[in-house]
From Swiss-Prot:
Keyword annotations from UniProtKB, A to Z: Cell cycle, Cell division, Cell shape, Cell wall biogenesis/degradation, Cytoplasm, FAD, Flavoprotein, NADP, Oxidoreductase, Peptidoglycan synthesis
Xref: Pfam families: FAD_binding_4, MurB_C
Protein name as annotated: UDP-N-acetylenolpyruvoylglucosamine reductase
Cited InterPro entries: FAD-bd_PCMH, FAD-bd_PCMH-like_sf, FAD-bd_PCMH_sub1, FAD-bd_PCMH_sub2, MurB, MurB_C, MurB_C_sf, Oxid_FAD_bind_N
Family under the similarity heading: Belongs to the MurB family.
Chain segments annotated as coiled-coil in the UniProt record: none
Annotated compartments: Cytoplasm
Pathway, per record: Cell wall biogenesis; peptidoglycan biosynthesis
Gene: murB
Molecular-function GO terms, alphabetical: FAD binding; UDP-N-acetylmuramate dehydrogenase activity
SUPFAM superfamilies: FAD-binding/transporter-associated domain-like, Uridine diphospho-N-Acetylenolpyruvylglucosamine reductase, MurB, C-terminal domain
Length: 325
């Protein structure tokens, strides 16, 4: 049985004010998450917090009762917020407090977790540091890239990481080495409550002409094969071993498949798009339908790459496809 929690941000804010009155960041009750995610759909965040800086975030976490659930979101490019909203506190780092790109060595940067990937690529271009061009084609922020080991054009975030800096749910600081991140394909194995705040990244010497050419190639490829002007969350599913997700989706007849306002893109069928008025229910139901059809056709069990968070709207629950249960 699924329990549904009433979203009442005003009441939660009033409850927390006595202990959190000293924060400098912004607290917004009942935040419409449609304004945050690239799908432009989904429910409310009960209390939405944007910390002013790392000190502010640590103070907030240290004084937030442990009974209050915390959800971390980034730029929202690969995020689906369910229609029933997100109980508790949603934390999103702002570019103002966590968007620095500081060159700290001839080929190294200290980068805030709220930095847009494309801005990191641009900074590396100006500094003539190679190895960051692939970020020009990733529509997200560094925090999400660190979490998911984001990559493109054969390069992954793990190839650039030296150290990652994080706060845990209690507001304690942690420094993680590359080995501590335990990276694998689109995954890192660190505690779920860690909030990445920054990372030390290392590239290699380069020249502006070659770097710009590599970035242009990334942009041209992305424009030619991905529905970049649609309301989408990027790649819907991780690639199975030894084959592309789009190929098994296409072979199963799911290119263009539609449920409500949600559709698997005709241009790139591993991209799910909101054609106009899709609900989160439509999008998740479409994804699970694709998973079932692909498994029935080819026995490939697709795993979601898009992050799905929050609670379902009462009476509109999407069951996760499980062929073994």
């Amino acid at each position: 049985m699924i329990n549904f929690q009433l979203i009442d941000g005003e009441a939660l804010l009033a409850r927390l004010q006595p202990t959190l009155g000293g924060i400098k960041g912004k607290l917004t009750p009942n935040m419409d998450m449609q304004k945050v995610t690239w799908f432009r759909t989904g429910g409310l965040a009960e209390l939405f917090y944007q910390p002013a800086d790392e000190v502010d975030l640590a103070f907030f976490l240290q004084n937030l009762p442990e009974s209050i659930p915390v959800t971390i979101v980034g730029i929202g490019s690969n995020l689906l917020v369910r229609d029933g909203g997100i109980p508790g506190v949603v934390i999103r780092l702002s570019a103002k407090g966590f968007g620095q790109v500081q060159q700290v060595s001839p080929t190294g940067f200290l980068v805030g977790a709220a930095t847009a990937d494309k801005h990191l690529a641009a900074a590396a271009l100006e500094a003539e540091i190679a190895g960051f061009h692939f970020y020009h084609g990733i529509p997200g922020g560094l925090g999400g890239a660190l979490k998911m080991n984001a990559g493109a054009n054969g390069v992954e975030t793990a190839a650039r990481v030296v150290e990652v800096y994080a706060l845990d749910r209690r507001g304690q600081c942690h420094t993680l080495s590359l080995a501590d991140m335990h990276y694998s394909y689109r995954h890192c194995a660190v505690p779920e409550d860690f909030i990445f705040t920054a990372a030390l990244l290392e590239g290699k010497p380069g020249n502006k002409g070659d770097i710009r050419a590599a970035m242009d190639e990334v942009a041209l490829h992305r424009e030619s094969v991905q529905p970049v002007r649609e309301k989408t969350g990027g790649s819907t599913f991780r690639n199975p071993k030894d084959i592309s997700a789009w190929r098994v989706i296409d072979e199963a007849g799911c290119r263009g498949l539609q449920i409500g306002g949600a559709q698997m893109s005709e241009m790139h069928c591993n991209f799910m798009i909101n054609t106009g008025q899709a609900t989160a229910y439509d999008l998740e139901a479409l994804g699970e339908t694709v998973r079932a059809r692909v498994f029935a056709y080819s026995s490939h069990l697709l795993q979601w790459e898009i992050q799905r968070i929050g609670q379902f709207e009462q009476g509109r629950i999407v069951s996760s496809f499980d062929p073994f249960n």
